[in-house]
């Protein structure tokens, strides 16, 4: 193999190695972001359920609440 061809193959191998590393890094970042999205969706669903419960049973008017035990 000529020196020019060998240098070109070497350069392509280096580029490929860098691209593979970048792809792996991006994939890991995407996995972490999806995990965060899943967690946030679960939290949001919990908040929706709590809000629905509050809407169904609103808090009593402070005048309707029984007095504290020390009265």
Curated annotation (Swiss-Prot):
Pfam families: SlyX. It comes from the Bacteria. Belongs to the SlyX family. This is Protein SlyX homolog.
């Amino acid at each position: 193999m000529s020196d020019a061809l060998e240098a070109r193959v070497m350069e392509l191998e280096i580029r490929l190695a860098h691209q593979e590393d970048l792809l792996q890094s991006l994939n890991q970042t995407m996995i972490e972001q999806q995990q965060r999205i899943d967690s946030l969706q679960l939290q949001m669903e919990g908040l929706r359920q709590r809000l629905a419960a509050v809407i169904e049973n609103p808090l009593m008017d402070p005048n309707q609440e029984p007095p504290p035990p020390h009265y």
